[in-house]
Design a protein with these regions (language model features):
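Charged, amphipathic alpha-helical linker segments immediately N-terminal to NTP-binding catalytic cores
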Residues: 3-38
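Pre-Walker A adenine-sensing motif
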Residues: 40-51
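P-loop/Walker A NTP-binding module and the surrounding RecA-like catalytic core of P-loop NTPases
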Residues: 9, 19, 29, 51-281
């Protein structure tokens, strides 16, 4: 109160105030970075168990109005996994698509901020970026920004040339524009898979998914399901009737009810686990 801060015994203080109070009480406070405890714990984790094949994690990026959301919606609505009663909750940060007993995990969060955090912490939560470019508009500033983020994170890129149903669509022009950004189509002698699609009619989307599965298979992605869980928080908040909730992407190990998780300098106990369809695990 003397410092102009009103707080109860159950509230947290900011670091500066906590250090000031500690000093006034005759002790020495040692400030730490927000993620320091988390990083030290991760350093102490050794990967346990056999590394086995895992699902690919996909982020869909692109310039505004190039059809990213429409493409995601079409894939969601056409997949076997999403035909269950009640559909899919639109606010979640991730969901799975199942096709012929094979799965893909899509991250539906703002891609740019996610990649910045990945670079800062030295971790990739995405394996493949699907870059959406409108066939009637071409490469735009956010397209270039998305390309740079993907390259900086060392992520595989698959291009979806969208809106091929439009009269003004020019697929070859798009390939030429992308070549200037050092993304050269495979049929132009490069190594980037580019698939013409229409998020409105669904044309080309089966081929796009097949291409993603092929790229993922070549990457030979693996993880262990044993030992403590490590991963990424995609989004978090407070939900009425449930309290604090978070969408997690587990990259190694297994997470169980009653486990404790550490995020930054905060710890919480897992009270319940649900899948992307909001069903208890």
């Amino acid at each position: 109160m003397n410092n102009g801060i009103m707080a109860t015994v159950n509230q947290s203080l900011d670091q500066e105030t906590a250090v000031l109070i500690t000093t006034e009480l005759g002790h020495v406070g040692n400030p730490i970075q927000e993620n320091e405890a988390e990083e030290k714990m991760l350093e102490g984790f050794a990967q346990e168990g056999e590394q086995i094949a895992r699902d690919a994690i996909i982020s869909v990026l692109g310039h505004v109005d190039h059809g990213k959301t429409s493409l995601l919606d079409y894939i969601r609505n056409s997949s076997v996994a999403d035909k269950e009663e009640g559909g899919i909750t639109q606010s979640i940060g991730a969901y799975q698509v199942s096709i012929e007993d094979k799965n893909l995990t899509f991250i539906d969060t703002p891609g740019h901020a996610a990649f910045s955090k990945m670079r800062a912490r030295g971790a990739n939560s995405t394996d493949i970026v699907v870059l959406v470019v409108a066939a009637d508009d071409g490469v735009q500033p956010q397209t270039v920004e998305a390309i740079n983020h993907a390259k900086a994170a060392g992520v595989q890129i698959v291009v979806a040339i969208n809106k091929i149903d439009k009269p003004e669509a020019d697929v070859d022009k798009i390939k030429g524009d992308l070549a200037k950004e050092e993304l050269v189509a495979e049929d132009w002698g490069g190594d980037i898979q580019m698939v013409p699609v229409s998020a409105q009619s669904g044309e080309g989307i089966p081929e796009l998914l097949e291409t993603i599965f092929l790229v993922a298979e070549i990457m030979d992605l693996k993880a262990s399901f044993e030992g403590p869980a490590t991963g990424v928080v995609l989004e978090s908040g407070v939900k009425r009737g449930e309290g604090a909730v978070a969408t997690l992407l587990i990259q190694q190990g297994s997470l169980n009810t009653s486990d404790f998780i550490l995020v930054g300098d905060q710890t919480r106990k897992i009270r319940a686990l649900k899948d992307f369809n909001d069903k208890p695990i």
